[in-house]
């Protein structure tokens, strides 16, 4: 098993409310848990409005499977509707160190 980090950076659409977005992102948890591969998730935003969604997955396959299905899942629609699509960048990376 190779723990995989999924790092997605993006901006919200103009006028999108950060609190509403964070709630919509939290409402995706059942879907993410259903995948069976999510370990943990952190969502942050910097002072310039760049958001980072950082999810640890049990494997690269689990990460890619979830990424492929998230756009069609009804639980993800409110969250995805607030993201400026062209600003989004996703990458996956092998985790070499994890400290709690």
Predicted regions and their residues:
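A generic structural micro-feature
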Residues: 2, 45-47, 84
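Active-site-flanking beta-strand signature of metal-NTP-handling nucleotidyl enzymes
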Residues: 3-11, 52
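Short, surface-exposed ligand-recognition loops at beta-strand->loop->(often short) alpha-helix junctions
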Residues: 11-23
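Short coil/turn motifs at secondary-structure junctions
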Residues: 13-15, 46, 58-62
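Short, glycine- and small/hydrophobic-rich beta-strand elements in well-ordered beta-sheets
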Residues: 26-52
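An amphipathic, aromatic/His-enriched active-site/gating alpha helix that lines ligand/cofactor pockets
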Residues: 32-39, 56-91
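Short, solvent-exposed polar/charged micro-motifs at secondary-structure junctions
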Residues: 51-54, 99-100
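Short, low-order "capping/linker" segments at domain edges
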Residues: 91-100
